[in-house]
């Protein structure tokens, strides 16, 4: 049940879930799990698939300093590529705390529920591990490896609450090669350099959309973890619920709030997925609740040079891609950092399409 496409990771992301680019200056193959495909099919026909949803609050984490110190201690004696050995220095920029080692770095954001780790030197030093695209790690293998790493290493941070599920969402494979070393030479073989699996969460069978409740693990071709990202809070019920619009009403609302004119023949909607919207800690309004929403991923193709485009369909045009998160409740709860929700309350956000990335940053 995987869908394979060879698009740039950045176009999948958001322009996010977006959604996602690697450290590598390469293209990426992306493969969706059945859950994502089925969720999009259900969303297209039924929206959230229910008339009412409970509202939740993100529980604040222990703080970025506390989480950074614990992770440094966790990996200081590691014999794997995920290590915090050696000298390091701290940098603070806004709500981000960065610990920078000789070969690695660790970013902890906001209240400590958003973390990113990379060991780029290890990846750069192992070109011999590259494999042909056909030999890439399968979705099933990446899910297995990812679950083991989360259970054995990140279980203190990736907690699964009552009525919650950790769900495999999609994978991406960083691809290099495919070009010519010189004009007239045969194209180099495309090879996989690393693979990433992204998990999401559901509560009572309702998906979390947005950057919150995402965890991504990057592996080399031997199945060794070399990096991870997560934005993973705990939630508490508010005791309140929200009535949800039917799908056609959500789509009509999207026509008014989306960044692109989705009725235009030049605009294509790539994805439509509904659930509970959590923007992630970096775009989170502490006063807001996690409420019903739908993610709409759309792109617009504009012909700039008609002559060039006529000669070659791969040139002479530009493509703009966006991910908008559309409130799906009959009554929309206030959220000072959700542009579309602000507009529903008659407020003008700084950017109409300042949508957070739908998943951890992987570049």
Per-range role (PLM):
Residues 104-110, 215-219, 272:
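Broad, structure-driven detector of short, well-ordered beta-strand segments within folded domains
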Residues 232-297:
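Charged, low-complexity helical/coil segments in non-catalytic cytosolic or luminal regions
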Residues 197-199, 206-215, 219-230, 235:
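Extended amphipathic alpha-helical interaction segments
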Residues 2-16:
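Bacterial N-terminal signal peptides that target proteins for export
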């Amino acid at each position: 049940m995987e869908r394979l496409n060879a698009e740039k990771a950045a176009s999948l992301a958001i322009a996010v879930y977006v959604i996602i680019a690697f450290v590598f200056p390469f293209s990426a193959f992306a493969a969706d799990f059945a859950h994502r495909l089925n969720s999009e099919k259900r969303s297209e026909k039924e929206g959230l698939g229910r008339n009412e949803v409970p509202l939740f609050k993100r529980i604040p984490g222990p703080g970025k300093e506390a989480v950074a110190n614990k992770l440094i201690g966790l990996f200081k004696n590691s014999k794997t590529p995920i290590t915090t050995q050696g000298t390091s220095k701290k940098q603070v920029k806004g709500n981000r705390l960065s610990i920078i080692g000789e070969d690695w770095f660790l970013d902890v954001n906001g209240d400590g529920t958003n973390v990113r780790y990379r060991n780029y030197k290890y990846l750069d030093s192992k070109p011999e591990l590259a494999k042909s695209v056909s030999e890439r790690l399968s979705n099933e293998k990446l899910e297995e490896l990812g679950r083991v790493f989360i259970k054995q290493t990140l279980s203190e941070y990736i907690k699964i609450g009552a009525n919650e599920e950790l769900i495999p969402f999609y994978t991406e494979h960083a691809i290099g090669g495919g070009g010519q070393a010189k004009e007239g030479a045969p194209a180099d073989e495309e090879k996989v350099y690393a693979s990433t699996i992204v998990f999401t969460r559901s509560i009572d069978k309702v998906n979390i959309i947005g950057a919150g409740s995402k965890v991504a693990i990057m592996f080399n071709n031997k199945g060794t973890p070399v990096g991870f990202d997560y934005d993973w809070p705990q939630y508490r019920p508010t005791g309140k619920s929200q009535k949800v619009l039917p799908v056609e009403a959500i789509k009509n609302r999207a026509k008014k709030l989306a960044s692109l004119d989705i009725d235009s023949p030049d605009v294509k909607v790539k994805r439509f997925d509904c659930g509970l919207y959590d923007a992630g800690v970096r775009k989170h309004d502490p006063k807001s609740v996690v409420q019903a929403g739908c993610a709409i991923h759309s792109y617009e193709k504009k012909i700039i040079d008609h002559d060039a485009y006529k000669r070659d369909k791969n040139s002479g045009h530009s493509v703009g891609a966006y991910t908008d998160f559309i409130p799906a409740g009959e009554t929309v709860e206030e959220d000072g950092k959700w542009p579309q929700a602000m507009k529903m309350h008659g407020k003008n956000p700084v950017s109409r399409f300042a949508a957070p990335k739908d998943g951890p940053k992987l570049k």
